[in-house]
Regions:
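A short, charged helix-loop
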Residues: 179-191
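Surface-exposed ligand/attachment interfaces on beta-rich extracellular proteins
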Residues: 58-65, 102-106, 138-152, 191-194, ...
Length: 443
């Protein structure tokens, strides 16, 4: 018989997740809680994709991956990784040791930042005396010639045809620049001092942005050979984690601070954009480990993945919250794994783990063979308003059958007994030529 009822539609969920507002106060397009789910362009929510090993055999006896990436060197596309005290060419998923005579100190926190400087890969980690360079092919890595101007730089950039490094072990507030067109020639006075420890470098618009925790400074070309760059402080806040600086379409620079995630568009102020993560998510992070967090821009989806330490005593990055530039909303976290570095390889997110592997994300429906536990919780709106208490609710849920799993739909509300309905999705591979199970197999 027909059901006499008022209709209350929840979704599409284009507002993403908001951990700072009670479920009762969210709009129908908001999400109260979620795990391992993604929000699509139509506002649909789906379980995230999984990951598989990029290199089947662990590098360096299962040491921690401290950097990875994909670059074109000598006309060939190369995948590389720093793992423990070694540097590897991992092109094609097979690791070849290219450490040579370079010194690489192993340690989970000795992560590398790298740039492609013309036809040379250059990387720094703030721990080893020299920056490391690699020209690809069958060559080994080697120490960068820096004319003995600095040691142990933490941050690096390539801009205006020059190599830039910042926060060296003796003068942490200084940024050095190479000669134009020559990354291994460094003048004795070719540096800029900023008064505070440099926390990150990133080209932005027509400038080089230099981050300190106390502000963002810019270096701008002057066209004058005597003073080739003018220096100016633009904001009163900068990042605490250099590996989280990401520039996205629309000329917006995103980065992490202790209280949240901010954006800078080039003006005199920065803006916090992660209010939706306050209260229910951000306070659970280990703030002491945020300087070791990192971020990755996923161009195909226009997403920024922030790898963060969830848990008061958590030291490794075990939680990924995602900002959608297209929807201007947040979703996540993704969890169930730990990562130490990330990069785009073959247009997909890849991340290094603590066991010598690069993991290829956004692939398959499981995590290297393990099931993904995912859920999301909608807003909790009163169907007839706050003044009316309903005794019965009729729930209709729409979903797509895309795999072999069970779908559970749970309803909870005040004064109404909670109910869980489990729908057995069955195996999409079931056909007339295989075993058919009533109420489970798909026709």
């Amino acid at each position: 018989m027909p059901i006499a009822a008022e209709s209350l539609r929840l979704g599409p969920w284009r507002d993403g997740v908001n951990y700072s507002v009670p479920a009762e106060d969210l709009s129908p397009s908001g999400i109260h809680d979620m795990q391992n789910c993604t929000v699509g362009l139509a506002g649909e929510v789906s379980k995230r994709k999984g990951f598989v090993k990029f290199n089947s055999s662990a590098m360096n006896s299962g040491a921690t991956v401290t950097a990875l990436g994909q670059v074109t060197l000598a006309g060939a596309e190369k995948v590389f990784a720093f793992c423990g005290n070694k540097f590897f060419d991992v092109t094609g998923g097979s690791a070849t040791d290219r450490t040579g005579s370079t010194t690489i100190t192993a340690g989970n926190d000795y992560t590398w930042q790298w740039v492609l400087a013309g036809d040379t890969l250059v990387a720094v980690n703030g721990q080893d005396t020299d920056a490391i360079k690699w020209t690809g092919g069958s060559n080994n890595a080697a120490a960068l010639d820096d004319d003995s101007r600095f040691t142990k730089p933490n941050h690096i950039a390539f801009w205006e045809n020059r190599l830039w490094v910042g926060n060296t072990n003796t003068v942490p507030d200084r940024v050095w620049r190479s000669d134009a067109g020559d990354i291994e020639t460094w003048g004795a006075l070719n540096y800029h001092a900023f008064g505070y420890d440099v926390t990150g470098l990133s080209p932005f618009q027509s400038t080089l942005s230099v981050h300190t925790e106390q502000g963002i400074h810019t270096l701008t070309p002057t066209g004058n050979s005597t003073i080739p760059f003018s220096q100016q402080q633009r904001t009163q806040r900068g990042t605490i984690a250099g590996r989280t600086i990401v520039t996205i379409p629309g000329e917006r620079q995103l980065f992490v601070r202790e209280d949240g995630i901010y954006q800078w568009t080039g003006g005199p102020a920065v803006e916090k954009i992660s209010f939706a993560l306050d209260d229910g998510y951000w306070p659970n992070l280990n703030s002491a480990r945020l300087p070791y967090s990192f971020a990755l821009f996923y161009p195909a989806e226009e997403q920024v993945w922030f790898f963060l330490p969830f848990g008061a005593s958590q030291t490794q990055m075990n939680s990924v919250v995602i900002y959608s530039n297209r929807l201007n909303c947040w979703f996540g976290p993704y969890n169930g794994f730990t990562r130490n570095a990330a990069a785009m390889i073959d247009e997909l997110p890849h991340a290094g783990d603590f066991a010598g592997h690069i993991q290829k994300h956004e692939t398959g429906n499981n995590d290297d063979g393990s099931a993904i536990k995912a859920f999301f919780e909608t807003a909790s709106l009163a169907p007839l308003g706050d003044a009316v208490q309903c005794r019965w609710l009729y729930n209709r849920t729409l979903f797509d059958n895309t795999g072999d799993f069970d779908l559970s739909v749970t309803q909870t509300s005040a004064s109404i007994v909670s109910n869980v309905e489990t729908i057995q999705m069955g195996d999409l591979g079931a056909t007339l030529n295989t075993t058919f199970t009533l109420d489970a197999s798909v026709l």
